[in-house]
Regions:
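Conserved nucleotide-sensing/catalytic segment adjacent to the nucleotide-binding pocket
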Residues: 1, 235, 338-340
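Electropositive, glycine-dotted interaction segments
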Residues: 3-198
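Short polybasic amphipathic segments
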Residues: 17-24, 221-231, 315-316
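Long, charged, glycine-rich C-terminal linkers/tails
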Residues: 202-222
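Conserved ABC ATPase signature
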Residues: 215, 219-258, 265-267, 273-277
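Post-Walker A helix-loop "phosphate-sensing" segment adjacent to the P-loop in P-loop NTPases
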Residues: 259-263, 290-293
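Short alpha-helix of the ABC ATPase nucleotide-binding domain corresponding to the H-loop/switch region
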Residues: 278-283
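C-terminal lobe/lid and adjacent interdomain/linker elements of RecA-like ASCE P-loop ATPase modules
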Residues: 284-390
Length: 390
């Protein structure tokens, strides 16, 4: 199964899904031994001059037959408009799947079908099965840690992966969580205590757990995280909230990175993976994941250490142009230092797009000087002393 999509930048800096395709390749053991490719859906949409959407669905003959089913085309158009306005996928919407299922139910009411209608029904059933498989794959194997989850450590929380979602654990105090989070927290601590000492020497986690009742009178667990550091022959126990932001950030990502390292089907996306993490430590972790990880890791970062540990083909740079936001640096050789090339490109602007706005050190110095004079010119109001009675 192959799922493809085209992304179209908008004037307000967002991204529209302008085309989605789903193809099915037959097994090489079938037919003449060559994997025959079958297009189940090629859906393209664009915005016309008056703001109305123009769309096509291919193969045209089969989808034309499916659209002829009662209310099907109207439901497709409604979902196209909604998904376009919300900048999301049309194919993976619940409404699209519901419409396909309803179409199959309507067609199946007829005992005798024309050849084209029968072919359309068979394709529709294949598409329903494929979408279920892809949706299940995404729920089980794809995880996205946004800036919101990552930044939670700055506010005394650690993100924890729970099923296909993220929860946050308050680490600033003992907290009562639902009973079904017990295994998730225990797994997080266990994984951390295997990996943490290899990247942060002499550091482990400890979790105090006690039976409790939640605010809604359901079974819960009272949880308080601590860190344990070995200092000579002694162990020093401190609340986990007192650890550095980088350590808390790593603990929050460990379950995801562990899955990426071990599972070939895992696809993990992390926004600003470098936030608060010591750059040498970040580089060592990324190098191991790149060389030995079995899954796929997609991330954004500001730290240039990444350019020294990852192959250039795995890196895409952002630009200042909202209409052409990403590019690869040209002229990179095996012996090139990508970090030096990037810094030079920013300074002399030798790439097709500007990688970052150029900043004049002299103008920055002048601005600081002016800002300082503003403070000097600010005069505190004087308070008039009361007159004493003569």
């Amino acid at each position: 199964v192959t799922y493809g999509l085209h992304l179209q930048p908008t004037e307000d800096g967002k991204t529209q899904v302008s085309r989605e395709t789903i193809e099915l390749r037959a097994s090489k053991n079938e037919g003449n031994g060559k994997g025959r490719r079958q297009t189940l859906l090629d859906h393209a949409v664009s915005e016309g001059e008056l703001g109305l959407l123009d769309s096509t669905m291919s193969p045209a003959n089969k989808w034309g037959s499916l659209k002829s089913v009662r209310k099907a085309e109207a439901r497709f158009r409604q979902e196209e408009t909604l998904s376009w306005s919300q900048y999301r996928s049309f194919v993976f919407s619940h409404s699209f799947m519901d419409t396909l299922t309803a179409i199959d139910g309507e067609i199946s009411k007829n005992d005798v079908l024309p050849k084209i209608k029968m072919a359309a029904r068979d394709m529709n059933r294949q598409l329903i099965d494929v979408l279920k498989i892809l949706s299940q794959y995404a729920r089980l194997n794809m995880r996205v840690m946004t800036t919101r989850e990552g930044a939670s450590v700055a506010f005394g929380y650690v993100p924890i992966e729970h099923g296909s979602n993220f929860d946050v654990l308050d680490i600033g105090r003992p907290v009562i969580v639902p009973e079904d989070l017990r295994l998730t927290i225990e797994q997080m601590v266990k994984q951390s205590n295997i990996v943490l000492p290899t990247v942060v020497p002499n550091l482990q986690l400890e979790c105090d757990m006690q039976e409790a009742v939640t605010e809604d009178k359901k079974p819960g667990v009272r949880v308080f995280l601590k860190s344990v550091r070995s200092v000579g022959d002694k162990e020093v126990h401190i609340p986990f909230w007192a650890e550095s932001e980088g350590v808390k950030r790593i603990v929050g990502m460990l379950s995801l990175l562990t899955r990426m390292f071990n599972e070939p089907d895992a696809c993990i996306a992390i926004d600003e993976i470098d936030a608060g993490v010591f750059e040498i430590l970040l580089g060592n972790i990324l190098r191991v994941l790149a060389e030995r990880g079995r899954g796929q890791l997609i991330f954004t970062a500001h730290n240039l250490r990444v350019l020294e540990v990852l192959p250039s083909k795995a890196i895409v740079f952002s630009t200042s142009n909202a209409k052409n936001r990403f590019l690869s640096i040209k002229g990179v050789r095996d012996t090139s230092n990508l970090r030096d090339m990037y810094i030079r490109s920013v300074n002399i602007n030798d790439q097709p797009e500007e990688l970052a706005p150029r900043i004049s050190p002299s103008r920055v110095a002048v601005a600081f000087n002016k800002a300082g004079r503003v403070a000097e010119m600010t005069v505190a109001p004087t308070v008039k002393e009361p007159e004493h009675a003569q």
